[in-house]
């Protein structure tokens, strides 16, 4: 499977694995991971000890379906995940950029979550 990946995906996968060695989420401080494609953005908050997703937001949801993949949409997704975390009384997370550069949409998601009071 790894041989089928193109160069860009291989480099992202290598960065992702390097990052994941040091990032681990707990129930008190779960891991917030970002995935972006050309059409969608999704964010999950994961408790790695239990192996469960605590909250998730995606542009595939009905309320966010009209959003495109751009910085403004990333900020809206970040704010939505922040609201859902506040409902579950989670105010601190570990940010996992998932191998993507901390720029553009990924940064906008982080800034949107920070705007709601989430710390990382």
Swiss-Prot record:
UniProt xrefs under CDD domains: Ribosomal_L18_L5e
Origin superkingdom: Bacteria
GO biological process: translation
TM region positions: none
Example of a GO cellular component annotation carried by this entry: cytosolic large ribosomal subunit
Keywords: Ribonucleoprotein, Ribosomal protein, RNA-binding, rRNA-binding
InterPro entries per the UniProt record, alphabetical: Ribosomal_uL18_bac-type, Ribosomal_uL18_bac/euk
Molecular function per GO: 5S rRNA binding; structural constituent of ribosome
Subunit annotation: Part of the 50S ribosomal subunit; part of the 5S rRNA/L5/L18/L25 subcomplex. Contacts the 5S and 23S rRNAs.
PANTHER family linked: 39S RIBOSOMAL PROTEIN L18, MITOCHONDRIAL, LARGE RIBOSOMAL SUBUNIT PROTEIN UL18M
Role, per record: This is one of the proteins that bind and probably mediate the attachment of the 5S RNA into the large ribosomal subunit, where it forms part of the central protuberance.
Family the UniProt entry places it in: Belongs to the universal ribosomal protein uL18 family.
Record-given protein name: Large ribosomal subunit protein uL18
Organism: Treponema denticola (strain ATCC 35405 / DSM 14222 / CIP 103919 / JCM 8153 / KCTC 15104)
């Amino acid at each position: 499977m790894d041989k089928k990946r193109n160069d860009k995906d291989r480099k992202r996968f290598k960065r992702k694995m390097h990052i994941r060695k040091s990032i681990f989420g707990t129930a008190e401080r779960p891991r917030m991971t970002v995935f972006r494609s050309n059409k969608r953005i999704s964010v999950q908050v994961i408790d790695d000890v239990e192996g469960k997703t605590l909250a998730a937001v995606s542009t595939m949801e009905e309320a966010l379906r009209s959003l495109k993949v751009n910085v403004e949409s990333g900020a809206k997704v970040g704010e939505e995940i922040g609201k859902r975390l506040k409902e579950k009384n989670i105010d601190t997370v570990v940010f996992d950029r998932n191998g993507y550069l901390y720029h553009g949409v990924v940064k906008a998601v982080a800034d949107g979550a920070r705007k709601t009071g989430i710390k990382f």
